[in-house]
Amino acid sequence: MQYVREMSSDLATFASGLLALFERSAGVPLRELALVGLTAAIITYFATGLVGVLANRLEAVAYPRERDVHVTPTPRMGGLAMYLGVLAAVFLASQLPALTRGFVYSSGMPAVLVAGAVITGIGLIDDRWGLDALTKFAGQITAASVLVTMGVAWSVLYIPLGGVGTIVLDQTSSILLTLALTVSIVNAINFVDGLDGLAAGLGLITAMAICIFSVGLLRDHDGDVLFYPPAVISVVLAGSCLGFLPHNFHRAKIFMGDSGSMLVGLMLAAASTTAAGPISQNAYGTRDVFALLSPFLLVVAVMFVPMLDLLLAIVRRIRAGRSAFSPDKMHLHHRLLQIGHSHRRVVLLIYLWVGIVAFGAASTIFFNPRNTGAVMLGAIVITGMATVIPLLRRRDNY
């Protein structure tokens, strides 16, 4: 009963918080955020069809390879349509009465446009002509450096171990951490982009989680304009992914390509970085570990599935006496397909796993972490059961 009362209290607090947010529209402009996200979705949706025609004319087409899941040639370059949606939505945000204040006090959103143009351009070249890994990596470093140069960087880091608490990063540490995390997230999304709708869906889910977390930050910091950038960046990315997804879900009419997957990764990195920087311990207290760690946990949510897949792949290939980076058809999504899941079900299962971590981290700003943990545990059990159902059916058949 005590747990039920606590959960009811949390829900009441959340509901009253939402009402307060609508009442304080000047501090937390939910309607403007929704309009910006909708704009990104609409522009991306209609631009994707045009980009598909352009990709076919330029012969930027993904032909099926032995390790691929798709069986028909499919145009790439979807990232161009996504960037156009982002560009239009950010421009709209800069013209709206409340959100425009975020452009005055922060360069986060312009930084995303410039860095996004760099990484989308690199991706488009790769989608059409192909680039070696080193050149692509150099492009990723360049785009991440643009973010840092324009002021998007981790400035503080909360370490809950050994009584360290919050540490203020010096310039060198800030640059190195931001570059490392940005490039890691970019490659994580790129790595996981192996099934129709997977990268776009993961981008949508994680961006929504960051947006919810950012709205909570705005509430707790009395509408501080320093928290406008993560809210705008994440809602724009969510809208762009949502607009692209109808074209990309199984069976995909177009792939986002490296231009899209790297753009998604870059924007997720920028959103989590801008959310982490100005968090005040005065709003949460040093004991509220989960609220202070949530920006970093959101990064973990983005990288959880692809990094687990990458580590398992490296171990598997080394044990087999092959190069750690040699391609194969034993990735997590390949294995889920092999045990009997359909293409769509595999994508939905991975959505669930990432969503549990992402929304679990974001919800700590609204709910008691203990209650959040209990709900997450239940979700993990249910999703785990759904994941292994085909194996259980096989055993029953034997």
Swiss-Prot record:
GO terms for molecular function: glycosyltransferase activity; magnesium ion binding; manganese ion binding; phosphotransferase activity, for other substituted phosphate groups. Coiled coil: none annotated. This is Decaprenyl-phosphate N-acetylglucosaminephosphotransferase. The keyword Hydrolase does not apply. Signal peptide: none annotated. It is an enzyme of class 2 (transferase). The record marks D126, D127 as: Important in orienting the substrate. GO terms for cellular component: plasma membrane.
